[in-house]
């Protein structure tokens, strides 16, 4: 009693060859199943509990605002996130870049148009006609003609914001110089001073615009 099947050599000698192979296969199969179950349980605990708790705890400790979603408050109420763009269509506000998802965070996506798509060409052409009302001549900002891959881009280029200064100033009855100064004050540099290009957060800019007198 207590001896394994493999160590019981006396019994094995009395078993027919095919029965011996059958028992060997059963033993190996259960051994592999046991290893697989233990590996699955260990990885589940590690990846589904320990790692998420570690990352969440570190984020809350070192980046509490970002971990909470980079939420923007106005009078104690949440008005949006600095990471998620919002649609603005009024002439009194700066407009974001086109979005194939309508800035719906629940259906984040791009247009999936190919470079030879006629629908893409028509959409870009329509955007160009609208933008020419603000910049009749010269090069238009490419970010105002193309949609982002996520459809939720919260930023536009400084050039795209400056192009809209005249319209916003006229709609609000403000001096263009004051609006332009506001835009330049909201230009964010590259991440960590290295990655990306200068940009303007549209939601932050429009909130500051409401406070401009």
Regions flagged by a language model, labelled:
Residues 2-3, 10, 17-18:
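Intrinsically disordered, low-complexity segments enriched in serine/proline and basic residues
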Residues 17-28:
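Short, Lys/Arg-enriched N-terminal segments with co-localized hydrophobic residues
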Residues 27-28, 39, 48, 53-171, ...:
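Flexible, solvent-exposed loop/hinge segments and secondary-structure transition points
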């Amino acid at each position: 009693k207590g001896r394994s099947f493999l160590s019981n050599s006396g019994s094995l000698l009395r078993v027919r060859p095919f029965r011996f192979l059958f028992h060997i296969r059963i033993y190996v199969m259960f051994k592999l199943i046991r290893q697989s179950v233990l590996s699955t349980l260990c990885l589940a605990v590690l990846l589904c509990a320990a790692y998420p708790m570690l990352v969440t705890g570190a984020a809350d400790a070192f980046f509490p605002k970002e971990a909470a979603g980079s939420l923007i408050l106005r009078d104690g109420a949440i008005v949006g996130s600095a990471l998620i763009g919002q649609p603005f269509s009024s002439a009194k506000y700066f407009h974001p870049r086109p979005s194939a998802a309508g800035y719906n965070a629940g259906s984040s996506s791009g247009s999936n148009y190919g470079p030879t798509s006629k629908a893409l060409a028509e959409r870009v052409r329509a955007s160009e006609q609208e933008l020419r009302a603000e910049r009749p001549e010269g090069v238009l900002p490419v970010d105002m003609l193309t949609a982002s891959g996520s459809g939720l881009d919260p930023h536009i280029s400084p050039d795209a914001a400056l192009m809209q200064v005249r319209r916003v100033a006229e709609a609000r009855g403000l001096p263009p110089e004051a609006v332009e100064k506001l835009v330049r004050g909201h230009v964010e540099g590259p991440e960590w001073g290295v990655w990306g290009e200068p940009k303007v957060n549209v939601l932050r800019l429009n909130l500051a615009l409401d406070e401009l007198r």
